A protein has these predicted regions:
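Hydrophobic faces of well-ordered beta-strands that scaffold small-molecule active sites
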Residues: 7-16, 44-48, 69-76, 116-118, ...
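Acidic/histidine-rich catalytic cores of soluble enzymes
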Residues: 146-242
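Active-site clefts of carbohydrate-active enzymes
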Residues: 233-240, 268-286
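A short, acidic, amphipathic alpha-helical segment used as a generic capping/interface helix at domain edges
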Residues: 202, 244-266
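Active-site acidic/histidine proton-transfer and metal-coordination neighborhood
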Residues: 2-3, 87-189
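Acidic-and-aromatic substrate-binding clefts and catalytic sites of carbohydrate-active enzymes
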Residues: 20-26, 45-60, 124-126, 133, ...
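Alpha-helical scaffolding segments of alpha/beta enzyme cores, especially the outer helices
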Residues: 32, 36, 55-66, 99-106, ...
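N-terminal pre-domain/capping segments
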Residues: 1-103, 109, 185-187, 290-305
Length: 305
């Protein structure tokens, strides 16, 4: 494409994946991470997560207000690091997950985000239908609370049998859930991630076309999921070019082609398109981020006008 990617997409970084020290919300150096991203004008958006220290959180909010970045809030770590499950068939467990996600909405508002993203929890075949109803209950309650603040709620589509083993996807089930949600909640949407698509045995074209009416947010990254004995197998979001990875420049280009053909390049109101990349073992986070930019730059250069 001759035109800049920034005309059509808000390129973002999931800060707590690229710099995972804050995954549990307790990184004392979180302001340094946020400043690093805010000072890099490659990025139009930043995705943040919980910051448990109230004083640090207020300083972060001030920094983000100054940055002119689109701020997004990922509530997934609140569930993944605590074992809470938004579709828990035990009502007490479901309510505990809902409570932390309600707190996430408040925190997102303070940080300047216009909503939160979360994921469905683990499931069992014998209680799958009940878990689905529990997830509807949680999500409807979140949407009602967010609606009063003019905020949105997004559910990220994950794998169902490899790593996170989440109730939602694959794509057809995600579409059913989103349709059920949209009957009562117009502030609900779906987030898709290129790194999860190989893990649900689907293609970008199939996923985007199946979920098209409901998609509000995009992630892009890599995964190792073809060989269970391979280093880094599972939902680890390795850098592009990682041995055994499913996604690289070719797959990012295919993803962009599908988004373009399906009308997701919107110059008036661009969608967030964020890198979800994570250092593997002792890799340097800054180099991993540079790798992601380089990969996207090449894919964009190859994309036909």
């Amino acid at each position: 494409m001759r035109e800049s990617i920034h005309k059509y997409l808000q390129v973002g970084l999931i800060s707590f994946m690229a710099y995972p020290a804050n995954m549990r919300g307790a990184d004392e150096n979180i302001l340094d991470v946020l400043k690093k991203v805010a000072c890099d004008d490659y990025f139009d958006a930043i995705e943040v997560n919980w910051i448990k220290n109230p004083a640090l959180r207020e300083q972060a909010a001030k920094l983000l207000r100054t940055s002119h970045l689109k701020v997004c809030y990922g509530a997934q770590p609140r569930l993944l690091t605590t074992g809470l499950n938004a579709c828990d068939v035990n009502e007490e467990g479901r309510k505990a997950a809902e409570d932390t996600l309600m707190e996430a909405i408040d925190e997102a508002e303070q940080l300047g985000a216009d909503g939160i993203a979360f994921l469905a929890g683990k499931w069992a075949e014998e209680t799958k239908e009940l878990a689905y109803e529990q997830l509807l209950k949680t999500t409807r309650n979140l949407c009602a609370y967010a609606k009063a603040k003019a905020m949105n709620v997004e559910l990220e589509v994950f794998d169902y049998d490899i790593a996170k083993k989440s109730l939602i996807g694959p794509a057809p089930l995600a579409a059913k859930f989103a349709a059920d949600m949209r009957t009562t909640c117009d502030n609900f949407g779906l987030m898709i991630d290129l790194s999860h698509i190989p893990m649900t045995y689907e293609s970008p074209e199939f996923v985007v076309r199946t979920l098209r009416p409901y998609i509000t947010h995009f992630h892009v990254g890599n995964t190792v999921c073809q060989d269970a004995s391979a280093e880094g197998y599972g939902d680890e979001h390795q850098r592009f070019g990682f041995p055994g990875g499913s996604n690289d420049t070719k797959e990012v280009l295919e993803y962009l082609r599908v988004l373009k053909s399906e009308g997701f390049f919107n110059a008036e109101k661009p969608y967030v398109f964020s890198f979800e990349v994570k250092p593997w073992q002792d890799e340097d986070p800054d180099v991993v981020v540079a790798n992601a930019k380089r990969t996207l730059n090449r894919a964009w250069a190859l994309l036909e006008d």
